[in-house]
Amino acid sequence: MRHRKSGRQLNRNSSHRQAMFRNMASALIGHEIIKTTLPKAKELRRVVEPLITLAKEDSVANRRLAFARTRNIETVAKLFNELGPRFAQRAGGYTRILKCGFRAGDNAPMAYIELVDRPEVAEVTAE
């Protein structure tokens, strides 16, 4: 029985799941918005939100903890230099999940996961 077991398995073994969320967290922190399946987005929220909370207080120990969880220097630099100060006054809820229909190949529910308060990007229109 799976009583009181939190988290989703997502049909992967534990090391594959850990590597996938490590890569997805780096992508979300780098791009500030990514498109993925809805269950993966919901699980990714559980990985990224503690990282941003960790980045609110810049210390060597916190940087090492963040690096241990992401294994990416650029991600850690952006976390502590940009995202930590940006979310300093916000007590949690750093991400937003927007449903965006179903994938054409297998009808999987898709979603955008983004960081709230991300800077607006001017859209380029084709002329």
Swiss-Prot record:
InterPro entries, sorted: Ribosomal_bL17 (IPR000456), Ribosomal_bL17_CS (IPR047859), Ribosomal_bL17_sf (IPR036373)
Q: Name one GO cellular component term.
A: cytosolic large ribosomal subunit
- Its Gene Ontology molecular function terms? structural constituent of ribosome
Q: Which residues form the signal peptide?
A: none
State whether keyword Ribosomal protein applies.
Answer: yes
* GO biological process terms, semicolon-separated: translation
The entry's keywords: Ribonucleoprotein, Ribosomal protein
Pfam family of the protein (one): Ribosomal_L17
Which parts form a coiled-coil structure per UniProt?
none
Q: Which SUPFAM superfamilies match?
A: Prokaryotic ribosomal protein L17
> Quaternary state and partners of this protein?
Part of the 50S ribosomal subunit. Contacts protein L32.
HAMAP family assigned to the protein according to its UniProt record, in alphabetical order: Ribosomal_bL17 (MF_01368)
Question: Family assignment?
Answer: Belongs to the bacterial ribosomal protein bL17 family.
Q: Under which name does UniProt file this protein?
A: Large ribosomal subunit protein bL17
What organism does the UniProt record list as the source? Haemophilus ducreyi (strain 35000HP / ATCC 700724)
Q: Which gene holds the coding sequence for this protein?
A: rplQ
